[in-house]
Every structure is written in C-alpha cells, then in structure tokens.
C-alpha cells in the first residue's frame, strides 16, 4: 500500500497550512521531505495543493457530464431475476476457518497487484524481464518469496475467516437474507443509473421468490501488527512494509481459495475440472464474489449485517469498528452469488 506522508508547516494558528502528498515508493519519502523542508518548501506545498484542486475540479466536471436516468426509469429497465434459476446448495449455514493453511492460499496470490503496490506496474511474470523495471522487480520478488516462506513455515501470520450460505430473496433493489433464527436482514443495493448501460443491481441476481446467497468475512492479518513492530524495532522498515503487502495479497488469495471451496464443496454448482489458480484470479468461473466498499456495493455499514449473520467476532480475531472498518485492516467482507451471469 502507498505510504502517506503529511507535512505540517507551523505558524500561527491563523496561518497553519497542511500539504498532503502520496508516495508510491518508500524511497520517495526522502525526496518529498527534502522539497518540503528546502528553501522552496512553500512553493512545493502550494504546487501540491494546486494540483489537487485541479483533480477535484476534473472529478466534479466528470460527475456533471454523466448522463444519468431517474431511478424509477432504471428500475423499469432492470433485467429482473425471473430468468435466474436458484441453485440449492449441498450444505447451508456457516463454515469457520480458524487457521487456514498459508500454503493453500499461496497459489492464488495475484503478484501483479503486489508489484503495483511497489510502484512497479506490469503483469506478472512478464514484469520480471522488463528492460527497465525487471531488475528491481526481481529483487522485490525474491525478498517477498523469502518472507513468504518464513510466514508459512514459522506461522508468523494466521489466516482466519467465516463463510456461509443462507436463504435469500430479492425485493426491488434490496436483498433479504434469512439468519439461523429465521429473521430477515435487509441489504440495500445500488442500481446503475447510467443511460445506455445495463441498469443492473446485485439484487437482480437473487430470485424474488426464494434463493440462496453466500456471505464471507476473512483476514490474513492476524499477527501482522506484532510482526511489523518486531521488524521496526530492529530498524527494518522495509520488511515491515513487505509484511503488510504480503498480508494484503494473502487476504485476497485466501478469499479466492475460500470461494473455490464454496463453489465446489458447499454450493456444489461447480463440477468437473476446477479452474486453475491463474484462471480463478482472472475470475474465469461461474458465480461472483464481491466485497463491500467497491462500486457494486459501496456501503461499508452492510459489513455489520454479515458479521452478525456469520458470528464473525465470536469465532475469529476480527472486529468491526464503529465506522465499519475491519480490524485488522488486511481483511475482506462481502457476498457470493451463484448466478451463471
């Protein structure tokens, strides 16, 4: 993940100003500090703020130019769930993963995103032979493999999660999920209102007369705080950052591995030769997995409903803050759909 550097230029309370910049690479921090603390620091801070104002104005312009249709019209254009055939799962209820094997998640790591986090954009494994980025990419990759082996062999991180399949039905743009006590929880979904596009909502992929939905919450961040603090105490900030990035990638890989298990063993709609990890990372399988906070369902508060459905805080080390952020931060929470589309 990029590192945030905040520089506060102190003056009187009336003239206090703040410049906030983004460093994609750790080594860029020194360059930013040198400019901020140098004789032209004020000019640099002013340039940062001017660039950010230009970005805000461009974002606002794009929003104004979006051709949206009224929500009532978008709902009339919905494809509906009538064509959707519910898939009855083999097993319902919860499945707890108290200590998922890192080795089982490792094949699902998307290394392209790992390199992007270091500012090395390119597809893995081709980036390792890139004429300009290859040398640095190979070094970072070797360091990542060494630390990943330690994480796996010394059990430095614990992968924990809960997933389950529950009865569900759609009602307009909402998904209603029935918990173990027969109570319905309402999950409001957004609907695409862009003119000329499919005005879909996630609720369209759940049948109104009865269906099933998967829920999950998982993390690869148990133990990361202690591991990073140990590295920093030894003056090894690089390894602390590396551990954080690997925990992020392992969380996504863990989610892919659990989704594969759900499709084949719990839901049972995936048969025959399973997708390879490479195919799974590219989403080449039936069904979909989505996490809250992304465009299809940006409402983080829905995590509370899923946490309660799965009894996440009673069975794992994950906690949900009052602002609906998951602790540890290297975590995912969302829904799974069996729809063939």
Where in the sequence are the language-model features?
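Conserved structured catalytic cores and adjacent interaction surfaces
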Residues: 1-12, 16
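Short acidic-hydrophobic, aromatic-tinged amphipathic segments that line or gate anion-handling sites
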Residues: 17-25
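Active-site loops and adjacent core secondary-structure elements that bind or stabilize anionic groups
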Residues: 24, 30-241, 245, 263-266, ...
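Charged, low-complexity helical/coil segments in non-catalytic cytosolic or luminal regions
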Residues: 251-263
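Extended, well-ordered alpha-helical scaffold/bundle regions in very large, multi-domain proteins
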Residues: 269-288, 292
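A glycine-rich beta-turn/hairpin centered on an aromatic-Pro dipeptide
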Residues: 288-315, 320
């Amino acid at each position: 993940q990029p590192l945030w550097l905040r520089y506060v230029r102190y003056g009187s309370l009336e003239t206090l100003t703040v410049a906030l910049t983004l460093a994609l690479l750790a080594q860029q921090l020194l360059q930013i500090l040198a400019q901020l603390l140098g004789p032209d620091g004020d000019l640099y801070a002013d340039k940062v703020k001017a660039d950010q104002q230009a970005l805000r104005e461009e974002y606002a312009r794009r929003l104004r130019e979006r051709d949206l249709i009224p929500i009532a019209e978008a709902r009339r254009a919905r494809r509906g769930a009538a064509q959707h055939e519910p898939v009855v799962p083999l097993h319902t209820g919860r499945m707890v993963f108290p200590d998922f094997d890192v080795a089982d998640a490792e094949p699902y790591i998307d290394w392209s995103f790992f390199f992007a986090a270091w500012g090395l954009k390119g597809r893995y494994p081709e980036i390792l032979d890139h004429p300009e980025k290859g040398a640095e990419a190979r070094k970072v990759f070797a360091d990542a493999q060494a630390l990943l082996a330690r994480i796996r062999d010394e059990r430095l991180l614990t992968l924990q999660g809960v997933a389950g399949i529950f009865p569900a039905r759609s009602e307009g743009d909402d998904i209603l999920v029935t918990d173990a006590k027969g109570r319905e929880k309402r999950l409001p979904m957004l609907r695409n209102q862009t003119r000329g596009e499919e005005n879909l909502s996630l609720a369209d992929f759940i049948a109104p007369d009865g269906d099933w939905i998967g829920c999950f919450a998982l993390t690869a961040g148990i133990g990361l705080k202690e591991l990073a603090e140990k590295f920093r105490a030894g003056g090894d900030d690089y390894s602390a950052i590396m551990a954080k990035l690997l925990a992020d990638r392992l969380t996504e890989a863990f989610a892919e591995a659990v989704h594969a298990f759900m499709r084949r063993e719990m839901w049972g709609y995936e048969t025959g030769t399973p997708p390879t990890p490479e195919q799974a990372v590219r989403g080449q399988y039936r069904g979909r997995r989505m996490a809250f906070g992304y465009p299809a369902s940006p409402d983080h508060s829905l995590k509370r409903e899923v946490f309660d459905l799965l009894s996440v805080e009673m069975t794992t080390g994950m906690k949900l803050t009052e602002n609906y952020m998951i602790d540890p931060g290297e975590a995912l929470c969302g829904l799974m759909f069996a729809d063939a589309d």
